[in-house]
């Protein structure tokens, strides 16, 4: 094999590894209960593949705290992340209820309808409400 063939083979291997890393990223990771800020994150592999994920943690004061924490995780997997927006989530596991509302002052408002669809993949038996009201 010449150098170009070796380089091409190496790039294909790296791309396959980043595709596998992207496939392994959970769509939803949020706090088990309470009212907390959340962000939508678009995660990209080295090629054209991407997916939107939802992250929300009660221990994070700012939307940027959530994004920065998760961005570090994605970087270690060889993935790139962008945040198109955020908001708040009210999570009541006893009532099987989620409410998605508000916006992020730093990132803007996430697409709450898309957030609802993504949350429903992890919480199919929940009632999920969206609202553009509130902060």
UniProtKB/Swiss-Prot annotation:
The keyword Repeat does not apply. Somatic and germline cells. Isoform B is expressed in both sexes and in somatic and germ line cells. Isoform A is expressed in males and is germ line specific. Pfam families: Ocnus (PF05005). Keywords: Differentiation, Sexual differentiation. GO terms for cellular component: cytosol. Gene3D superfamilies: Janus/Ocnus. It comes from the Eukaryota. The active site is at residue 63. Substrate binds at residues 37, 104-106. GO terms for biological process: cell differentiation; sex differentiation. GO terms for molecular function: protein histidine phosphatase activity. InterPro entries: Janus (IPR007702), Janus_sf (IPR038596). JanA and janB regulate somatic sex differentiation. Transcription of janA gives rise to two sex-specific and one non-sex-specific transcripts. Belongs to the janus family. PANTHER family: BCDNA.GH02250-RELATED (PTHR12258:SF5), JANUS-A/JANUS-B (PTHR12258). This is Sex-regulated protein janus-A. It comes from Drosophila melanogaster. The gene is janA.
